Amino acid sequence: CIRDRGIVANIASVLSMTLGCRVSNIVSHDVYDKQGERHLGITQLPIPILGASQEKIKELRNYFHSLEIEDLVLVDFSTIAQQSRTYDEYEREMYSANEDDLHYVGIGICAEKKAINKATGSLSLIR
């Protein structure tokens, strides 16, 4: 489990951006304050940031893929992603990586709430 809050925040941001692009209607409509100034919509869904070991993250990734959920959106963040300086480098490294070479440091999942809670219920919020 990563302890550095800056790294955790960065990983969570990357995962959230991908989820936001891949899940329709995750971001709600804009709102307006009393002066009429617009504030862009934010997510309607809770996005808890949970702590887990690399092994647990890989286990969760494999578990959700095994369920064959039709509307599953799953994005992972590996040490390869963390260490790559450019997207081209990331793509090259991923293309040559075997599954055993992939060590996940984060995962973002959008699926049925019941399935997520069942799989992650034992994990604690990062504080």
Describe the function of each predicted region.
Residues C1-I2:
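Short, small-residue-biased leader/transition segments that mark boundaries at the very start
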Residues V8-L60:
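Short, well-structured hydrophobic secondary-structure segments
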Residues I42-G51, D71-R127:
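Short basic, glycine-rich beta-strand/loop surfaces that mediate nucleic-acid
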